[in-house]
Swiss-Prot record:
The lineage of its organism: Eukaryota, Metazoa, Chordata, Craniata, Vertebrata. It is found in: Endoplasmic reticulum membrane. Residues 1-7 are lumenal. It comes from Mus musculus (Mouse). Keywords: Endoplasmic reticulum, Glycosyltransferase, Membrane, Signal-anchor, Transferase, Transmembrane, Transmembrane helix. The keyword RNA-binding does not apply. It catalyses: a di-trans,poly-cis-dolichyl phosphate + UDP-alpha-D-glucose = a di-trans,poly-cis-dolichyl beta-D-glucosyl phosphate + UDP. This is Dolichyl-phosphate beta-glucosyltransferase.
Amino acid sequence: MATLLLQLLGLGVALAAAALILVSIVAFITATKMPPCYQHEEEKFFLNAKGQKEALPSIWDSPTKQLSVVVPSYNEEKRLPVMMDEALNYLEKRQKHDCTFTYEVIVVDDGSEDQTSKVALKYCQKYGSDKVRVITLVRNRGKGGAVRMGVFSSRGEKILMADADGATKFPDVEKLEKGLSDLQPWPEQMAIACGSRAHLEKESIAQRSYFRTFLMYGFHFLVWFLCVKGIRDTQCGFKLLTREAAARTFSSLHIERWAFDVELLYIAQCLQIPIAEVAVNWTEIEGSKLVPFWSWLQMGKDLLFIRLRYLTGAWRLKQTRKAS
């Protein structure tokens, strides 16, 4: 009996090793060698307040604003106004009290099927295209792809990612700024502050089903085991990056959908960019685009492929800054 058990154990280990090798080969063969940084001709422009086309700037240009806010939006015509009102009210008040403070809000319509762009353009007309810009993508790329398009078209010294649902209280950007400041001195002007909901975990568990709680813990384990160490909440959509950190990390980003946050932080840790995790005020907002089981399954696959593709060299990091 003992011999049989040892044989079965050996067979199990061999099958697991063979499966890992097979998955690694598939991950390597199917990998895109370079991040898909393509732009449709229509995506190289934004519409100003008069409805005229203007060319978008580049992340590699020198910054002309203190803060850029990138808002990825997919079918957000109903939730976007609440977020935009809160954000712009805060930013306008801050500018009124500090005349040196400058900002821009970039709404990236990720191929929406509703009136998201039209809703966003109303804010452009109200505040002017120097403060509010709308980029309309020709097709849906995914949240990561939309954020990257906004980041690459930003003008800020610091770049804030903020979800269109307004789940995080916008004034908490000051907490992220404090988190960045506490990381100084920044190596090569690079640092990241991540908004975190980890302090709300016990409360959220009490409101979730056992199945969703199991999925959440499983995802957290895979993130820790495969990709990112030391960050309890990788998925909060409220993140602040220095311009150099944004340029370096997003230049190497491959994942365009929900797991892009994990790859972003994985890249940052590989580049030894300091990261602060900062507790923020967050509220569950109805209308999430995340389908619990299938989205978590997709993210689990993405996590495995992130690790294997970097490990096998199918994906590599961009180490140098693009010349201006």
